[in-house]
Amino acid sequence: MKGKIKMSTLKCKMCGGTLEINENETTATCEYCGTEQTIPKITDDVVGNLFNRANTLRLKSEFDKAEEIYNKIVGLDNTQSEAYWGIILCKYGIEYVEDPTTYKRVPTCHRTSYDAITADEDYKLAIQYADISQKIIYEAEAKAIDEIQKGILTISQNEKPYDVFILSLIHI
């Protein structure tokens, strides 16, 4: 039965559903949304609770607060690839939404950057500390996010400039 002991309960990064995590697993598939995803190394309940809190905040688009918690996790254990990945998701304002045609969870960017996600130091650290199965998922997600970012930047560069005036009416 080694490897089948219930280790910790975490929330899905995509939909917020409960993931049952077994010992030594580094990826899991959510039974609610079907997304295969990376999971953190849980060393104790404190770390598990911090990951769940950060994820909950990120799911509510409270990216700055979530990023603070991911940084706190890195302060406790600087080899947590999942914490670095969480920081990346917050920096780029990533929310996973359900595609109405495929029902798959796809990334949506609430924040745009001219820099590729793969050039970010936190991404490099996530890759450095990830195992092979986590790296595959991180690299695929980073590629998808980079494509979305490029699309957003292309659209914004093709927009005609316009002036915005703020008018205020003074009632006498």
Describe the residue ranges of each PLM region.
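Conserved small/polar residues in nucleotide/adenosyl-binding loops
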Residues: 170-172
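Residue-level recognition of tetratricopeptide repeat
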Residues: 80-81
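Cys/His-rich microdomains that often coordinate metals
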Residues: 16-19, 37
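Alpha-helical segment of the N-proximal tetratricopeptide repeat
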Residues: 45-65, 69-72
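Short Cys/His-rich micro-motifs in 6-15 aa windows
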Residues: 34-43
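Short coil/linker segments at helix-helix boundaries
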Residues: 43, 47, 93-154
